[in-house]
Structure formats: C-alpha cells, structure tokens
C-alpha cells in the first residue's frame, strides 16, 4: 500500500469535501428567500440551514468513529461521499424550507469523509513522516473551504443557485469514486 498515493487521493477528496461544504454558504440567505421565507425569518432559517448540519455531525461523529474502528476508514469515506452526494445534490430539488433543513440535517448525519481520511493516513504513514503527511492532508480541506465560497458565488451568479447544489453533489460523488478505486486500505479491526 502506497501511503503517498493514498495521501494524494485523500487530499483531493478532502479538498472537494471542504469546497462542497463551503460552496453553499454565500447564497444560503438568497436560497431561503427563494423558498418563500420573508423578512426577519430569512436570517434565522439561513443560519439554521447552515448550523443544523454541523450540530448533527457533532452528535453522530462518535458513532461513525466506532464503525470506522470496526470496519475500516475507507468504507466510512465511501459512505460519507455517497450519502452527501444525495443530501447535498438533493438540495437542488427541495420545494420548501422544511426539506432544506431536513437534507442539511441528514448531510451532517452522514458526514465524515475528512476525519476518516485523516485517520486512514495517520494509520499508514511512517511515524517520522506523520507530521508532514497530516499537515499536507489538512491543507486539502482548508484550501477547499477557502475556495468554496468564491466558486459557489461565481457559479450561482452565472448558472443559478440550484445548479450549485448539483455541482456539489458531483464533487462529492467524484470524491467517493476516487476513494473506491484509488484508496487502498489493509484494515485490521481495533481490538
């Protein structure tokens, strides 16, 4: 198993995941308005739509960690990528604010690509290279998170907000596919 190859793929997947999460932030209030929310309620529902994902992720992350220890990091990366493909891509089709909040909640429930990529690389890299490898990996999610709002705003301006969600779904699907075919893991369950 080449940890360097895994690092390259995990970096790109983490970049796509970070970008996907932050792509939607700049225009969430506008999207909430398009769903029929008006006045002071726009800020509330936009904030709720953004934060509900983080809150649900915080609550279920320990469960995904236990399952990663039992079944491996790669399956958890694939699960997160494929599930978030549906939850984020599905936002393009929400008819109202309730579906938006529900899919954002589910998105948080099924998240976990980046922490599992980190755990995978940490378990494979030689000890004397762990700082450099994990530092490199973290630049992927940071670069994606920094790039996402600009790209999301640009795409929303030209192609419309709902198409940004489809693009995000495609990014997450690509991360899952790259993980399936190029990430290698010789997993031994944690005793």
Regions inferred by a protein language model and the residue ranges of each:
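Paired small-residue
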Residues: 87, 98-106
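Symmetry-related core transmembrane helices of the 12-TM Major Facilitator Superfamily/SLC fold
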Residues: 164-181
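Cytoplasmic helix-loop-helix junction between adjacent transmembrane helices
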Residues: 103-141
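Conserved MFS/SLC helix-loop-helix module at the cytosolic interface between two early adjacent transmembrane helices
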Residues: 59-91, 95
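Helix-loop junctions on the cytosolic side of multi-pass membrane transporters
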Residues: 179-190
